[in-house]
From Swiss-Prot:
NDH shuttles electrons from NAD(P)H:plastoquinone, via FMN and iron-sulfur (Fe-S) centers, to quinones in the photosynthetic chain and possibly in a chloroplast respiratory chain. The immediate electron acceptor for the enzyme in this species is believed to be plastoquinone. Couples the redox reaction to proton translocation, and thus conserves the redox energy in a proton gradient. Its EC number is 7.1.1.-. One of its GO terms (molecular function) is NADH dehydrogenase activity. This is NAD(P)H-quinone oxidoreductase subunit 1, chloroplastic. It comes from Adiantum capillus-veneris.
Length: 371
């Protein structure tokens, strides 16, 4: 089986040798190129999510949605981003300029870092850490601090209240999220995202953790929506209550960065759902898998399939994640916003006991299996 990542790396190293570039410099160039490709790809993914949300929302409300900016309005998000980039950046007169500027950066940067441990294919990952899933939880917990800093630096009561809500919401739902991830790690025997996907692929479609951990999947789904501050859990920026929450005093590109961070977090969350519960890059779907086995009997076709394998893996991962995103977007128009007390009760009195009970059941099953 061809390892395409190693193949490309070896080709580049051979090219660097011909150009008499040192090994350390060539490795630095490879890391920079891989990171740049990931950032560009993730940014394009965010633009697609924004367009998809607008189109799905328009369909739910019997509207047309984006139409004029490109075919089917596909570049409307890019046009809006350029518009925000050209707008004036206003700083509140009595606000803290340093904290006001640091808020958007603290929100966006950690979310980009979490993509380091997301496997888009068997060998398509920037950093296969042994603690990949907990690295994601640890890094993503920094984001509410940025929202709190942004609200405090704005010197606005609505902004500060939105930041406090974001911090309370994150603390409430990170614990059930971590317990669900720990249950998956117990089943897989590893905290590595690659190992978790490979454990599921051993048993095909029915080996996905979605079937083995249905309770954990539901708890993870609700917790991830709350972590991403999606409706019905968008209390930190509730327009009817807090004007625009922590974004009230922001304008221009800083205002746009909050939305970029929100959609980056949503995409990362959907990718982790795919990795943890939906088999990752594994294409073990009934009927389609059998057809692929019949076609691959030819040696020529088999070699072609080996060459195309990384593309198929990336396409499979993204297809599953956008399929999950479709249901996340639908919740925006089907469920009403909850109150703050209902939000905290749901996290502490419902999801936490369920996630803890699911962890105990998983641990008991694991002990019985080993014994």
């Amino acid at each position: 089986m061809i390892n395409s990542t190693e193949f490309c790396r070896n080709k580049l190293i051979h090219l660097f040798d011909e150009l008499e570039i040192t090994m350390n410099l060539s490795k630095s160039i490879w890391i920079f190129a891989s990171t740049l490709l990931l950032v560009l790809g993730v940014t394009m993914g965010v633009l697609v999510i924004v367009w998809l949300e607008r189109k799905v929302s328009a369909g739910v409300q019997q509207r047309i949605g984006p139409e004029y900016a490109g075919p089917l309005g596909i570049i409307q998000s890019l046009a809006d981003g350029i518009k925000l980039l050209l707008k004036e950046d206003i700083i509140p007169a009595k606000g803290n300029a340093w904290l006001f500027a640091a808020g958007p950066a603290v929100v966006v940067t950690p979310v980009f870092i979490t993509y380091l441990v997301i496997p888009f294919g068997q060998h398509i990952i920037l950093s296969d850490l042994g603690i990949g899933v907990f690295f994601w939880i640890a890094i993503s917990s920094i984001v509410p601090l940025g929202l709190l800093v942004a609200g405090y630096g704005s010197n606005n009561k609505y902004s500060f209240l939105g930041g406090l809500r974001a911090a309370a919401q994150s603390i409430s739902y990170e614990i059930p999220l971590a317990l669900c991830v720990l249950s998956i790690s117990l089943l897989s025997g590893s905290l590595s995202t690659v190992d978790i996907v490979e454990t599921q692929s051993k048993y095909g479609f029915w080996g996905w953790n979605l079937w083995r951990q249905p309770i954990g999947f539901i708890a993870f789904f609700i917790s991830s929506l709350a972590e991403c501050e999606r409706l019905p859990f968008d209390l930190p920026e509730a327009e009817e209550e807090l004007v625009a929450g922590y974004q009230t005093e922001y304008s221009g590109i800083k205002f746009g960065l909050f939305y970029v961070g929100s959609y980056l977090n949503l995409l990362a969350s959907s990718l982790f759902v795919v990795v943890l519960y939906l088999g990752g890059w594994d294409f073990s779907i009934p009927f389609v898998e059998n057809f692929g086995q019949i076609v691959s009997t030819s040696s020529v076709i088999d070699k072609s399939l080996d060459t195309l394998k990384p593309i198929v893996e990336v396409a499979t991962t993204l297809s599953k994640s956008y399929f999950y995103l479709f249901f996340s977007i639908l919740t925006r128009w089907t469920l009403p916003r909850v109150r703050m007390d209902q939000l905290l009760d749901l996290g502490w009195k419902f999801l936490l006991p369920i996630a803890l009970g699911n962890l105990l059941l998983t641990a008991s099953f694991r002990i019985l299996l080993i014994s």
